[in-house]
C-alpha cells in the first residue's frame, strides 16, 4: 500500500549517544545505541503529548492576540501546562524572587484544545511560579545555546512531580521550518533545581518549502545534527505539527537502520535485516511495514549515499 509520495523528506545523519531504553547494536565497530520497542513507544507517546501541548499553546496565543488593549509589558513569559481538568495557558511576569504574576490566562479541555477560552485570574488553580521558573531558565539557556529567540517551551509534569521542559524552535513563516535547536531540561517540583539539561541536536537548520528557481519542489537534505541512535520525540512532534514536511528519515550509518517518521505519528523501521523491519503504528502497536518500495528510502547498506 502506498502511504504518500515523498515530496519532502529531511534526512538526518545521527551522531553517537546513549540513553535509557536503547540497546547496543551487534558488531565490533558499532557504538551507537539503537532504540528498542519500548523506547520507540516512549518516543511516540511523548511526541503526541508535545503535539497536544503545542496545539493548546497555539490556540491560546490566537485567543490572546484578539483581546482588547493588550498590555505587552506584562507578558514577559508564557507557558501551557496541563492540570486534571484541562490545559492552562498563562502569560505574565516573573520577579527576581521567582514569583510568577499572571496577566492573562486561558483554559481548554484536555481533549479539545481548540476550545481555548479566556479564564479569570481568580479562577486559576493555585500558583504557577514553579513552572514559570523552570520555563524561564530553560528558554534563556536555549537562546544562549542556539542564538535564536523564536522558541516555544513545552512543560511535562513527571509522575514524581519533577518538571520536564522541552524548548523547541518556532516559526512564523508557513514555508520555512526549523529542525534541531532543541534542549530537554528537568527540574525539581519547585522549578528551582535543574537536574538535567540534554542538548538533543547540535544546531538549528532551516527547511524551506519554497519552490526552487526552476519550480522544483523540496525533496530532502542531509544534515549531521542528531546526537542519538534513533528518533527523538521532538523530531516526531515537529513532523506532526508541520505535516507539510511530509516525512522525516532519521538514520545513523553505524547502526544500518533507518527510522521513517510520518505526520500521523507512525515510525517505520527500515533495516538490511528483514526481521528488524517493522512499523510502530499511530495507535501504539507494532506491525509489518505497509508501504511500497518506491514510497520509502532504501535501507542503509554500508556507506549510505544521500
Model-predicted regions and their roles:
Residues 165-170, 250:
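Short beta-strand elements that form the blades of beta-propeller/WD-repeat-like
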Residues 173-177:
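Short consensus segments that form the blades of beta-propeller domains
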Residues 14-15:
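C-terminal motif of bacterial Sec signal peptides marking the signal peptidase cleavage site
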Residues 178-180, 216:
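Short gly/pro-enriched beta-turn/loop segments at secondary-structure junctions
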Residues 180-208:
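Short helix-loop boundary/capping segments
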Residues 27-160, 205-306:
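Active-site-proximal loop/helix of nucleotide/amide-processing enzymes and allied scaffolds
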Residues 2-9:
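Sec-dependent signal peptide recognition
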